[in-house]
């Protein structure tokens, strides 16, 4: 919630929570769905870009992301999905979402021109994707850090255009995805 996020970012001016939950930098009395909240998110994002903290990739890429906790590593493929797939039920929902929350996230994306919060999707196992992920993970990660909670986070950018095209082709053949 917003109060927990306010506590979390104290002493962390570069926290991306300031983009995804920008109300934490505003008076707590302001309504969460007020346009000023979205504008603050955009302002915070543009400051991170201007200061060189984050940058938009020059091309569309897929990424491999790994989390290691208690000796167990889980891997994921990171990319973008079409909102049309959500509305057309290619992406299956496991619960009813609140209309106000959907509109909130849509407004946030529209105003900031970014999607700051990941949505975890799962799909039936595809060996070809697993093989690509295995190969990518044999290389040195682009990012490798252990967070204060002890969880190790690693990520690899897949810059090879042919591999990205292959992943896109494979995923296009997946009949449906599920919100995890």
Could you say what each language-model-derived stretch is?
Residues 1-178:
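A cross-family signal for N-terminal binding/gating loops and helix N-caps
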């Amino acid at each position: 919630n917003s109060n927990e996020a306010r506590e979390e970012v104290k002493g962390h001016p570069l926290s991306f929570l300031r983009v995804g939950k920008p109300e934490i930098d505003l008076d707590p009395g302001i309504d969460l769905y007020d346009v000023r909240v979205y504008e603050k998110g955009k302002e915070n994002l543009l400051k991170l870009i201007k200061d060189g903290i984050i940058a938009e990739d020059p091309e569309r890429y897929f990424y491999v992301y790994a989390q290691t906790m208690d000796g167990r590593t889980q891997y994921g493929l990171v990319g973008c999905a079409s909102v049309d797939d959500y509305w057309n039920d290619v992406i299956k929902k496991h619960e009813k979402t609140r209309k106000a929350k959907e509109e909130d996230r849509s407004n946030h994306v529209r105003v900031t021109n970014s999607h700051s919060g990941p949505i975890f999707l799962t799909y039936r196992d595809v060996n070809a994707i697993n093989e690509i992920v295995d190969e990518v993970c044999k290389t040195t990660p682009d990012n490798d850090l252990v967070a204060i909670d002890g969880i190790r986070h690693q990520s690899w950018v897949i810059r090879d255009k042919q591999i990205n095209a292959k992943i896109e082709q494979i995923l296009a053949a997946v009949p449906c995805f599920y919100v995890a």
